[in-house]
Structures are given as C-alpha cells and as structure tokens.
C-alpha cells in the first residue's frame, strides 16, 4: 500500500527533482496533484520548476559537496534526476547509506549520464543492435576511427550533452576538424571525449516511452506507450506526433529492445528509449531514465501523460498507457535574445482547432531556445501536426 502524507507537515512525502526545466516542471505539477511535497533544484534561479514547487533551491549539481549537503539537509524520500550533469557518485553513496532513494536507481543514473555508459551496456553487455561506434579523446583518434572503421557519413556527439548540442554529421574528411571543435563546444561539462557513430540508413526514428511500475500483484511490470515519431533539426526535436505507424514485427522488436535495456537499468519510472527503424529492423540509439522532450505530445494524446506516468510509477501507483487520441507537438522558439520576454498571439494560437499551449517560463530567451510547445489532437496525426505547427507559428515572443 502506498501512503502519501500532507505537504508541509511532519509526515509529508517529499520528492526532490535535480534539474527543473520544462520537463521537470511538469513532473512537479503531476507530483503535487498527488499530494507530494516538492523540492525543485537547478543551477540557476527562477528555473521553470522553481516557479511551481513548494521549495526552490539553487546549487551546482555537479559539485559533490553541494549536492550531498542539500540532500542531507532536505532528507527527501525520493531524489529524481532530470538532467545528466549531476555528481552521480554522491547519489550512489547516499543511496547505499540509506539516506534517500534515487529514481530509477543511482546505478541507472550513472550509466545514462553520458553516452558511453549506456552504449556499452546496450551493445556490449546486452547485445542489442546499435550503429557501429568508437569513443575518442582527440581529433587524431577521431580521424583514425573514421578511417579505420566507421567511414563516411558519420555522426559525432559529445559523450555528455543534451538537446542536440555539439552534434553534427560528417560527410567527408574536410569536415572532421570542425565537427570535433563543435562537439567540444557543445558538451555539458568540461570534457574532451566524444562518440563517433556510423550513419544508420533508417526510415524513421521513434521514442518508445517505457514505464516500469508496480502492478496489482505488487510486482514491477513493463508497459509501453504508443510509439512517438519526431523530426529533428541539428539533433534537437522540433515536432513530435503519436502514434507513429510501424509494422507489427518492428514494434515487437522495439519493445523487446526497450524492455531489455530498461529491465537491466531497473527501478521504477518512465524511460524515453530512442530507436532507429528501417522496415522490420530496429537499432537502439539512446535512453533517458526520465520523461522525454518528444513525449510532451502525450499531454494531449494519452489519458495519463508521460509526467503523470512518471509520478505514479515512482510512487508505486498503478499506471495506464492508453492512447486517448492522435496528436502532435510543435516547438515554440524564443525568437529573440532577451530576458523576460512577452508572448503575443496567444489568443490567435488557441483559435486553431483542438490546440493547447505550454509556456515554460524560462527567464532568458534565445533565438533558438525552446520556450514553449504547441499541442494539438485530432482524428488523424497529419491534421494534428498541421494544427500544432500553425498554433506554434502564431506565437510571437518579443523583448520588452
């Protein structure tokens, strides 16, 4: 039986989120609806999650001393990492000491904090299909890896980055040096290690939201949401839709791969498993042990969206991954470099049929920063995609 206390009381059920961007914000809201006391942590003040949590804290989460001190002071029941740049050895130590429980586990957080840990687990330990890859610590090693094994075209990524930062495709030898420099500039922490991957000739890529939650018998079971299709530009998602049509054989294989990877990582919660698909062939790409940006579409497509699924699963509550309606999401960009922007056109955006918007409340805007998302549902995915894109285009951020 799951028992939840009253927030701001001695018996409160306390959950701390490490990382309080737009995804963390929605998780916090879902937790609060279930009566949980929430603590939002980020590296800068007034982060989106700070604006909705019971408590807002600002620290350098990659600093082990700061992270340990905060967790020991707050004593949350659960610690939920929402970003990769965290001092994971501290989480492992605190979990081992019985101070708190890390979601999904401290080990899973460590393995998925960069591309090397999870790629080696998937390809070398579990033997699931992936693109050919090498890890490199210098430009010379990168060039040698391409010449000796990977070939052209190929994709270079920092071992630790998010939202496509530092990622580029190399089509020939004259692009290698620039790709290396771009990866160095885009990494999440001071790091000189990259992954170079052989280019997979795929038909499309999907996110398969995979939920590990307790069933009626008390045992952890795995459930899958309908596949989410998405379009990326420069490694960063610009629109997503659900469901994405797939052959039955490919879907079954995708679920097998996602189940194997998340089962090894263990724990409870939602995982965003990214996969490449060509016909009936499926390759594993990446996994995040948390809600996924492409999964924001579930706020209009599912009875329980990805944030509610995560909140329920980590609290030991039952989940339902049923699709409610086809739908789509489209990114609303900042459009300007400024702080405290205002958004014109909100009324015009919401005049598009079956649409909704989420503005994230980020204190600083950049031209290509994701500041919100337009959502749409309809009888078919294509109509929903058109409407979401139209609603997003009507949003007009401006500096004041």
UniProtKB/Swiss-Prot annotation:
Top enzyme class: ligase
One GO cellular component term: cytosol
GO terms for biological process, alphabetical: 'de novo' IMP biosynthetic process
Annotated residues for binding of Mg(2+): 274, 286
Xref: Pfam families: ATP-grasp, PurT_C, RS_preATP-grasp-like
Domain ATP-grasp: 120-315
Pathway field: Purine metabolism; IMP biosynthesis via de novo pathway; N(2)-formyl-N(1)-(5-phospho-D-ribosyl)glycinamide from N(1)-(5-phospho-D-ribosyl)glycinamide (formate route): step 1/1
Keyword line: ATP-binding, Ligase, Magnesium, Metal-binding, Nucleotide-binding, Purine biosynthesis
Binding site for N(1)-(5-phospho-beta-D-ribosyl)glycinamide: 22-23, 82, 293, 362, 369-370
EC number: 6.3.1.21
MF GO annotations: ATP binding; magnesium ion binding; phosphoribosylglycinamide formyltransferase 2 activity; phosphoribosylglycinamide formyltransferase activity
Catalytic activity: N(1)-(5-phospho-beta-D-ribosyl)glycinamide + formate + ATP = N(2)-formyl-N(1)-(5-phospho-beta-D-ribosyl)glycinamide + ADP + phosphate + H(+)
Binding site for ATP: 115, 157, 162-167, 197-200, 205
Binding partners and assembly: Homodimer.
The family this protein is said to belong to: Belongs to the PurK/PurT family.
Role summary: Involved in the de novo purine biosynthesis. Catalyzes the transfer of formate to 5-phospho-ribosyl-glycinamide (GAR), producing 5-phospho-ribosyl-N-formylglycinamide (FGAR). Formate is provided by PurU via hydrolysis of 10-formyl-tetrahydrofolate.
HAMAP family: PurT (MF_01643)
Name of this protein: Formate-dependent phosphoribosylglycinamide formyltransferase
Gene of this entry: purT
